């Protein structure tokens, strides 16, 4: 699910989770998902990142809906937590304090926790925020495996459009309404993607992720070229002092 801030992405997720009632329209969720069928990974706040509990305790808390009114976790629930820690590669961190972990490790812990609640559907809200590039690639590798090998369905809100298009089966683009819904490979050719990738200012396209443009400095040769986005930009080559090397921006 992609879209600008305030477009309704998180609101839709909260509707799926039953945390908000729709003010209009109709939202239908399969019966088996209404109780223990959905695992949720919300955006982390600073307070959550500093949570003073062990990794095992955080993962086990995903079994709360299974535990009901019982004061203690059952052996089955502890086994589920252990299995999910092993699946996510965090067994060795079980007794470590959650707040001492890196951002990527914390995300693994929270996904293991979410898997304790369900094996059907994970809803992830901006899960890569604050992660470094290597941790982001590790994260996508992890959820790719969950989806393709363990058959866990994943709905993810993201601003990371490049990876979203590469990894997702389908893209839903919201802007208070549905601008696009369909296969990811069709999305990049849609008008919705064009608006998302570009801002218009006085009729001139301001390039973002899909376009590349150089700042004008002395000694530049300007050539108008058509970018992959379909817009025409002035691309520049900068001559490097002391040689004939040109740097394309």
Q: Where on the chain are the PLM-derived regions?
A:
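Conserved ABC ATPase "signature" region
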Residues: 75-93
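H-loop (His-switch) and adjacent beta-strand-loop-beta switch element
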Residues: 170-183
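Conserved ABC ATPase signature
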Residues: 97-101, 105
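ABC ATPase nucleotide-binding domains
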Residues: 185, 189-249
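Conserved ABC transporter NBD signature motif
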Residues: 25-38
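H-loop/switch region of ABC-family ATPase nucleotide-binding domains
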Residues: 158-159
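Catalytic Walker B motif of ABC-type/P-loop ATPase nucleotide-binding domains
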Residues: 122-125
């Amino acid at each position: 699910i992609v879209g600008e801030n305030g477009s309704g992405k998180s609101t839709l997720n909260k509707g799926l989770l039953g945390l908000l009632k729709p003010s209009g329209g109709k939202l239908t969720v399969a019966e088996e998902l209404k109780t223990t069928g959905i695992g949720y990974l919300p955006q982390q706040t600073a307070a959550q990142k500093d949570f003073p509990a062990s990794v095992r305790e955080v993962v086990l808390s995903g079994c709360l809906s299974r535990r009901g009114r019982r004061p203690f976790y059952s052996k089955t629930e502890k086994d589920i937590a252990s299995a999910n820690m092993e699946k996510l590669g965090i067994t060795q961190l079980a007794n470590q304090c959650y707040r001492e972990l890196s951002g990527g490790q914390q995300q693994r812990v929270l996904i293991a926790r979410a898997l304790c609640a369900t094996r059907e559907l994970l809803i992830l809200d901006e899960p890569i925020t604050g992660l470094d590039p290597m941790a982001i690639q590790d994260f996508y590798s992890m959820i790719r495996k969950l989806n393709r090998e363990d058959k866990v369905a994943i709905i993810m809100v993201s601003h990371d459009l490049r990876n979203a298009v590469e990894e997702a089966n389908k893209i839903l683009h919201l802007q208070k309404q549905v601008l696009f819904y369909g296969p990811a490979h069709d999305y990049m050719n849609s008008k919705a993607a064009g608006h998302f990738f570009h801002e218009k200012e006085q009729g001139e396209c301001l390039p973002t992720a899909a376009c590349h443009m150089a700042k004008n400095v002395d000694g530049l040769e300007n050539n108008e070229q058509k970018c992959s986005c379909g817009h025409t930009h002035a691309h520049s080559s900068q001559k490097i002092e002391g040689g004939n090397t040109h740097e394309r921006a």
